[in-house]
A protein has these predicted regions:
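Helicase-associated low-complexity/disordered flanking segments
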Residues: 1-84, 88-92, 297-328
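Non-catalytic terminal extensions of ATP-dependent helicases
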Residues: 2-3, 8-21, 332, 351-352, ...
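Conserved P-loop/Walker A NTP-binding site and adjacent catalytic elements of P-loop NTPases
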Residues: 65-67, 72-249, 256, 274-299
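Conserved C-terminal RecA-like helicase domain
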Residues: 121-123, 131, 138-147, 282-357, ...
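Conserved two-lobed SF2 helicase motor
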Residues: 158-173, 329-341, 349-369
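Conserved interdomain hinge at the start of the Helicase C-terminal
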Residues: 254-280, 287-290, 344-353
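Conserved segment of the helicase C-terminal RecA-like domain
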Residues: 374-377, 381-383, 389-430
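Compact beta-sheet-dominated globular domain cores
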Residues: 851-893
Length: 893
């Protein structure tokens, strides 16, 4: 049957002009909340009338079918089959290809569930995908009917449809078991069932929610008969497999020995655009994009259209400037290290058909909505964190399956590049032509030693091989056991049942039972859990065994086992700090940072910088080269309070055993930014991590949330309150994509992760903006004290203070003074002033930063006007009328 819908043309920004993944793709765009309006309301009618009764399954199916028909969407056979199975109360495993409308089936399931009065869940593996689907569902079901839970974000959590990460649902299932209010679940990207670290969260709900209807979705499932049989056994309901749908857009494959630039040129000439070029590192993706940008990828008309569509996007960061140039040439970049606003822009431009080429990583395979015609694989190997290896069949099909745009293409194209040495050999052969003598003289290049290679047979084997059977994963942790104990009753028996009924091998089950025994023993010995035998009732048989009851003796923290499981430890550890200490605020920040997930790319850059400094110092001290190499292995990034925190955590784990599931990770990212007076842009520049600025932003957002939500008010001094305001200001200013999307959905107040902003004020967050400007100016003082004139020139060239002008200014300073001080007095508010008199009329602050000298003359400094609008838009201090020198000269100017 024909169909005009696809789940590959989804928009991540409601109202952006592209279709929602749940709204039917190229069908008529749904009016806001039009499908949700067909369901009886979950809320008390405003007019005081009686709520309408819930629909029957048949009625719910008919209403959904009518909604799709009214919008010109004709369901494919496999979609209708799956929806009818769901309406009949069966489970469905939907293993159809990418682009075959799985999202529309999921929407039907969620609608039919809520219309029957069932609470429904949509789960996905990553927060970005959860967020995307949340906004898509809001568009078609209405704002009141959809909520989101990701551990750090809670929106409308009482809604009938909840979008969440798989771990959220798994923890609820452990905590509530059969009594959980979970009517139906659509599990997207179900191949994560086999993920070694996270697969447990996909298996646990299937084992512990016997009254829940499931739909398991993925384009690369492989053999799922064992999963289907297990689901039927646990729930008593039939599990239907819908796995034989044809690809709506068939694929063709080509293995090429041309250079990547040549491959792209040939594909463009052959009308095979848009292309997504897959790399297995972010650096490689950017390198290719920069190379291709010089090849005239886009026409003048395309470049103009891209420029128009990108209006309103701020490209203020270092990577942003690179991306702006690349987009202007028709080349996009897409990977996880980018700021969200840049990724969303690239996706939006792709959805509008404006980008001929996108260079990205294999994140393409994780549900992102980038409609493309051709996938080009630059390699058939990847580094998996341990070693280089060839792609597995599932990985290959996840990526290759994104080729071909339903509703646009008659076929999709998948191209694999040969290894570089094979491409070179092909060039030599082509140059020799048919001349036997020249052919004999060719010295073929070999793969480098240790290189994991591939060839055409590798490619063909991947095409023909079905995805591997999903290997089930299960683990037992202190947190999981605690959650099960919360139910009351015989928690150990329930954990035994969880293990015994799982799909693990007998050997794995035996190991899990031993682990469960160890955890229960630890929890009981520590007094956190008590085990009680309840005697049988008087009328029970004489051989009746006593009932066993496990109970907690402590109150669990709110949001236990979610995204910040070490928050209780942080609260306890704060008592170790002396509020009167000069380092109190920075030490508190270090404690917070130790509980956060590592931003690995940032820490690697810190370690590189530390090792470079150490090598230079050892070389200057005359240390022999071999010894330098040996010593350098012990040099790493800063880990403040490491010994204090490790000792405190060991003691804490004795009292709170479930903390053993987690690890502290001392580091200094936020602290380093503060101590070096760096703003976001300056810190990126300092470490040379422009390609990972999205990683830094996410880390700072987590740090802000922890400081703002976890640190008690009584533990916050004035300095810390300033820092929290500044950090929130920076995070919102650098990238407010999530806030913007929610505003587009109509209700900015519901996003509790965003601190409130002022209304009708030029400066929305005065405290945060003030600290941002103070830090920016004191960073210049610090750089001047260290005589880092080149860095000063790079910071201030845009407002007239080049490296040469800074050098002249500092030369003049040092004719009068020996040094520039950077101690506590130099950083104090007495050395910094703001004149706000023109804030409302001109949207500027007049600022003055004094340099502290050894004589206390305080006669040199920086004066300038802060552009408040640009500063708040970009999250960095933007100046006008900026000058440096002796104050009497500046005042004359």
């Amino acid at each position: 049957m024909a169909q005009t819908t696809t789940d590959t043309a989804a928009s991540t920004v409601s109202g952006a002009g592209a279709a929602s993944s749940f709204s039917g793709g190229t069908g008529t765009e749904a009016e806001f909340g039009s499908l949700g309006a067909l369901s009886p309301t979950w809320w008390e009618p405003e007019d005081g009338s009686e709520p309408k009764p819930w629909l029957t399954p048949d009625q719910a199916f008919e209403r959904f079918f009518e909604w799709t028909s009214d919008r010109g969407i004709e369901l494919w056979d496999h979609q209708e089959e799956a929806l009818m199975d769901l309406a009949a109360g069966d489970h469905v495993i939907l293993g159809t290809p990418t682009g075959s409308g799985k999202s529309l089936v999921a929407l039907g399931m969620l609608f039919m569930g809520m219309a029957q009065g069932k609470r429904c869940y949509y789960t996905a593996p990553i927060k970005a995908l959860v967020s995307e689907k949340f906004f898509d569902l809001v568009q078609v079901l209405g704002r009141d009917n959809v909520g989101m839970i990701t551990g750090d974000t809670h929106i409308n959590t009482k809604a009938p449809v909840i979008c969440c990460t798989a771990e959220i649902l798994a923890n609820d299932a452990l905590r509530e078991g059969e009594g959980a209010d979970v009517g139906c679940v659509a599990m997207d990207e179900f191949h994560y069932f086999a993920d070694p670290d996270r697969g447990w969260a996909w298996q646990v709900p299937l084992l512990t929610l016997p009254h829940t209807q499931f739909m398991l979705m993925s384009a690369t499932l492989g053999d799922v008969t064992a999963i289907a049989a297990s689901l039927e056994e646990h729930t008593g309901a039939t599990c239907d497999l819908v796995v034989d749908a044809p690809r709506p857009v068939p694929l063709s494959y080509d293995y090429v020995t041309t250079s990547l630039e040549g491959t792209v040129e040939l594909a463009m000439r052959g009308g095979e655009a848009p292309l997504y070029i897959v790399h297995f590192s972010q650096d490689a993706a950017l390198a290719t994009a920069q190379s291709l940008a010089n090849f005239g990828i886009a026409s003048k008309e395309q470049r103009e259209a891209i420029k128009e569509a990108a209006k309103g996007t701020s490209f203020s960061t270092a990577f942003g400037k690179i991306l702006k140039r690349l987009l202007g040439c028709g080349v996009g970049v897409h990977h996880a290290g980018m700021l969200p606003r840049y990724r969303l822009l690239v996706e939006r431009l792709a959805q509008q058909g404006l980008l001929p080429v996108i260079c990205g990583t294999d994140t393409l395979g994780v549900g992102i909505n980038v409609p493309i015609h051709t996938v080009v694989l630059t390699a058939l190997t990847k580094f998996d964190g341990y070693k280089m290896r060839r792609l597995r069949a599932r990985e290959f099909h996840q990526i290759a399956g994104r080729a071909g745009r339903s509703g646009f293409d008659t076929e999709g194209m998948v191209i694999a590049e040969a290894p570089e040495h094979e491409i070179e050999n092909a060039k030599l052969m082509a140059k020799a032509g048919d001349d036997p003598k020249k052919l004999r003289k060719i010295k073929k290049k070999k793969a480098p030693e240790g290189f994991v290679t591939w060839n055409k047979q590798t490619f063909e084997r991947l095409i023909e091989t079905q995805p591997e059977t999903l290997k089930p994963r299960l683990r037992i942790t202190h947190s999981m056991v605690i959650s099960v104990v919360e139910q009351g009753g015989d928690a150990r028996a329930r954990v035994h049942d969880l293990i015994e009924t799982s799909l693990q091998t007998p050997e794995e089950k035996a190991k899990l039972e031993v682990r469960a025994d160890e955890i229960f023993a630890t929890l009981i010995d520590s007094g956190v859990v008590v085990r009680t035998e309840v005697p049988p009732a008087p009328d029970a048989p004489t051989d009746a065994a006593p009932d066993i009851d496990y109970a907690l003796t402590v109150d669990l923290p709110e949001d236990f086992a979610l995204d910040q499981p070490l928050s209780p430890f942080l609260l306890a550890a704060l008592e170790l700090l002396d509020p009167e200490s000069e380092t109190y605020t920075m030490d508190l920040i270090s404690m917070v940072e130790a509980t956060l997930e590592d931003p690995k790319q940032v820490l690697r850059a810190q370690e590189r910088a530390a090792r470079d400094r150490a090598m230079a110092e050892m070389k200057a001290d005359g240390v022999e080269y071999e010894e330098r190499l040996e010593r350098i292995q012990d040099v790493t990034y800063e880990k403040p309070l490491e010994d204090l925190l490790d000792a405190a955590f060991d003691k804490y784990c004795q009292e709170v055993p479930w903390a053993n599931d987690y690890q502290l990770s001392p580091k200094s990212v936020l602290r380093d930014m503060l101590e070096s007076a760096s703003d976001f842009k300056g810190y990126i520049q300092k470490l040379g991590i422009a390609r990972s600025e999205g990683i830094l932003l996410r880390y700072l957002a987590e740090a802000y949330r922890s400081l703002d939500r976890t640190v008690p008010i009584e533990k916050r001094d004035e300095r810390l309150r300033d820092i929290i305001s500044w950090l929130g200001f920076v995070v919102r200013s650098v990238d407010s994509s999530l806030v913007d999307e929610w505003e587009n959905a109509g209700n900015p107040a519901a996003l509790d992760a965003a601190p409130p902003q002022g209304i009708d004020e030029v400066v929305a967050d005065r405290r945060g903006c003030t600290l941002l400007v103070r830090n920016a100016l004191f960073r210049r003082v610090t750089l001047a004290a260290r005589e880092h004139v080149r860095d000063l020139g790079e910071l201030d060239e845009d407002w007239g203070m080049s490296e040469i002008r800074w050098q002249k200014a500092l030369d003049a300073y040092h004719e009068q003074h020996e040094e520039i001080l950077t101690d506590g007095d130099a950083r104090s508010a007495a050395m910094f002033s703001i004149d706000e008199s023109d804030e409302k009329t001109a949207h500027v602050w007049h600022v003055h930063q004094i340099f502290a000298d050894e004589d206390g003359d305080h006669d040199f400094g920086i004066m300038g006007d802060v552009d408040l609008d640009a500063t708040q838009d970009g999250g960095e201090a933007i100046f006008k009328n900026y000058r440096v020198g002796f104050i009497e000269d500046l005042l004359e100017d």
